[in-house]
Amino acid sequence: MSVLLFGVSHRSAPVSVLEQLSTNEAEQAKIIDQVLQSSLVTEAMVLSTCNRVEVYAVVEAFHGGLSVIGQVLAERSGMSLNDLTKYAYVRYAEAAVEHLFAVTSGLDSAVIGEQQVLGQVRRAYATAEANRTVGRTLHELAQRALSVGKRVHSETGIDAAGASVVSVALGMAETKLSGGLGGRTAAVVGAGAMGALAGAHLVRAGIERVHVVNRSLPRAERLAKNLTEQGVVADAVGLDDIARALVDADVVLSSTGAVRPVVSLADVHYALAQRTLAGAEHQMVVCDLGMPRDVDPAVSGLPGVWVVDMDRIQREPSARAAAVDAEAARNIVAAEVANYLAGQRMAEVTPTVTALRQRAADVVEAELLRLDNRLPGLDAAHRDEVAKTVRRVVDKLLHAPTVRVKQLASAPGGDSYAEALRELFELDPQAVEAVAASELPLITTDLDKTE
């Protein structure tokens, strides 16, 4: 069994396609349930962010597993399988491992080095673990990926430039607004993690006033209070009053995770009309960071309004440029992938080695029993010495070849050595499988260590 990845991301598809595939946790659970109904899939996890939807699964067969996952995603998105595959990418076995490590490290993000994806992978794994849809393989893969991501961010400067989607969007807004963001007013739509991140960037940019708009007013009030404590004039606005919050906003940042746009054409049109009546400036930059889109596409056609969406961010040179230490990050990922795969190959041969040692122990015990029957008068002391000697001989004979076979098995193609052991010593495949099952680790959520 190997890991299969079926995914669609900002690198392979336009925002409109990602919108069709965008899912919440409840929908992700349904996708996993459908995928696991097939006997070809034994474990599954869904990673859904504003920039990607990826299904990681442990499959019995590549083509069969690929067909199952592709069909489920096509049905959930309302697309035909043929249309979906035009935008999809597939990674299998080693390539799937390398991809997830790169994702958690921020190397596959719209803006190289952004850290939010590490938390998103953590939540995806936690959800799958809570729903018991991951077993040994995905458990070990996810835990190692989180560890690799943390190492990359702590040992390199890949995120030194604050390379998040928010910072790039605001950088683009500053170039559009004469005089930058200092002393201006912003509207932050959505008071979740992205909203809080947007607020932090706005404070650093010298923004003077922030309207925090959210469906849950108490949540908006909490973020507004936090911004006020940082020296910004901030207030909370319910989503129903969003048009009012846009009237004096020079820049709008929206990322809510809503199914439909929350910033409508009517809302922005109303805000512009109020500005006209007041004789105020019409210029407004709207940063749509939502997935699906938070902003009605028609808004971009209004005079004086410039919309920054995910497609535009991806085309921004600063978003495509690697951080200073990106190469170092890639080297870490490559080394971690090699170490992980070597460990996995070694783990695969371990049950065979254990079964061989058990087979040898059984032979020793059988011969000692035969000795007891042939020499019933042998005293206990001599019998124990003979037993120890025989066991030492067997251990010494097996030590070098078993250690060596583990070393050889860790290299690519090393599974042939385990097969050779099974053939040479006529080891029962069922006995080997029984040993492997007994050696499965207790699956525990170890999220704190990767934060």
Curated annotation (Swiss-Prot):
It is an enzyme of class 1 (oxidoreductase). GO terms for biological process: protoporphyrinogen IX biosynthetic process from glutamate. It holds the Pfam family Shikimate_DH. It comes from the Bacteria. Substrate binds at residues 49-52, 109, 114-116, 120. Pathway: Porphyrin-containing compound metabolism; protoporphyrin-IX biosynthesis; 5-aminolevulinate from L-glutamyl-tRNA(Glu): step 1/2. Keywords: NADP, Oxidoreductase, Porphyrin biosynthesis. The keyword DNA damage does not apply. The record marks 99 as: Important for activity. One of its GO terms (molecular function) is glutamyl-tRNA reductase activity. Its EC number is 1.2.1.70. The keyword Oxidoreductase applies. Homodimer. Possesses an unusual extended V-shaped dimeric structure with each monomer consisting of three distinct domains arranged along a curved 'spinal' alpha-helix. The N-terminal catalytic domain specifically recognizes the glutamate moiety of the substrate. The second domain is the NADPH-binding domain, and the third C-terminal domain is responsible for dimerization. Catalyzes the NADPH-dependent reduction of glutamyl-tRNA(Glu) to glutamate 1-semialdehyde (GSA). Belongs to the glutamyl-tRNA reductase family. NCBIfam families: hemA, PRK00045.1-3. PANTHER family: GLUTAMYL-TRNA REDUCTASE. This is Glutamyl-tRNA reductase. It comes from Mycolicibacterium smegmatis (strain ATCC 700084 / mc(2)155).
